[in-house]
Amino acid sequence: KMLERYEIPCFIDEKQTVLMNPFIEFLRACIDMLIENYSYESVFRFLRCGLLDLTEEEMDVLENYMLGMGIKSWKKWQKEWTLAYRGENPEEVVKIEALRVRLMELLEGFTLRMKVRKATVSERVRAFYEFIVSCRIQQKLKKSEQYFEAHGEVGKAKEYSQIYAIVMDLFDKMVQVLGEESVSLREFKELLEAGLSEAKVGIIPPSTDQVLVGDMERTRLKDIQV
């Protein structure tokens, strides 16, 4: 408060939670979508996490069609979409069906593997990892890191540079500790949430021209000049 009162710029040297990162939202939305059996709300939380190859227009079209046709379960996603609603052009329905096929190519194998009731932690982690790879998440996070670097957002760039490794490390620990344990989807979600809630990223100061506030254990000062 004293620094703020005297308008002295400062940086608080502490690790930040990762829970607001799009990759974390992607993971949590995936799990909820499976648990909720592809409910309307869970599907659109997943689609709008910002890490899928869908345009805003494509997401809007899907949303309108799902609402209009009452598509709110995994079973309905597995069936071909051929019906129009509200006098919709049949050609538009063909485009919407193509979007469904694209998403099913991405999601079907992952969904079926994760829906196995007595799957082990290792099996669920493997399914999740392979799904992440198929979605090219690491490359997309790298692209975001480069964007933030180019726009001078050093803290964000640092976050995106660390987040993938943090999640992979969490997966490794889950396998090492509980790998052969059979867990339900809900139990797997609880394990994942517990790990993610503890995950933190280290952020570097955006500027050297400021007071650095930290503790003796974490903060290291090099080449100090007075």
Predicted regions and their residues:
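Polyanion-engaging groove/track-forming segments
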Residues: 1-226
